[in-house]
Amino acid sequence: MGVLGKRGGARSARNNDQHRQLLDATLALLAEGAAYAELTVQLIAERAGVSRPTFYAHFDDRRELLLELMDSALAPAVADLAGQGPTSGTALGPTRIRPTIALAMSIFRDHAPLFRALIEASTYDDTVRDWLGSLAAQFIDAAATTIRAQQAAGNALPLDPKAAATTLVWMTIDAAYRQVRNPPDLSDELVVDTLTTVAIRTVYGDQPNQHASAPAPPNRGRPRRR
């Protein structure tokens, strides 16, 4: 189910407890505020209570560990995209836009330290950057397919499906990251409502009769945390 496919199949017979300890140690260090660049193999191994050789028995490097954590965090979204979840099949259908965006925001929020590390690493690690691009591409392709279907049904505006999908997916990723990067000025729900309105108007224009099920953005937020 992972974006890059299954990695390290030969590792399945290795010590699962130590493997989990290394994953948990990394998550704990990130949750405590460590930047990804600060997470040396030695630091992770010490926190997990194992040796450096043990680390390398489970992972080729920090990058592989990070991406395994990402695969796990993203499992609900990937399952949804594959048609196994509550919003599957029509990611940009008029009644599915908000549930899809809300799912993305909740995953970012639930795994905030991990996503901060991912975005940080993507700025200087080509492999992580490519991984993030591959992740986005899955959702872009699904959204573009939905836009084409809605256009064929006479519901969507005559815009370029790939360009619209690319813009909306990266807009959502960027907005979700900004929400979890620092204490937010706005509530996650308000940002989800706003992204929903932007997406609906972009794809469908001002057609209120077709989008009666889409909630109107409420006027609520929360002050910046001090």
For each predicted feature, which ranges?
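Basic, helix-initiating cap at the start of DNA-binding domains
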Residues: M1-L39, L43-R47, E64, P223
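Alpha-helical DNA-contacting segments of helix-turn-helix folds
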Residues: F59, L65-A73, F139
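Short hydrophobic/aromatic patch on the recognition helix
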Residues: G49-F59
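Hydrophobic/aromatic-rich alpha-helical bundle segments in the mid-to-C-terminal region
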Residues: R129, Q151-T197, D206-P217, R226
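An amphipathic alpha-helix signature
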Residues: L23, R98, A102, A137-R148, ...
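Short secondary-structure transition hinges
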Residues: D110-D141
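Short, basic, alpha-helical segments at the C-terminal edge of helix-turn-helix-like DNA-binding modules
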Residues: V41, M70-V78
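Hydrophobic alpha-helical connector segments
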Residues: E68, A82-D110, A165-L168, V192
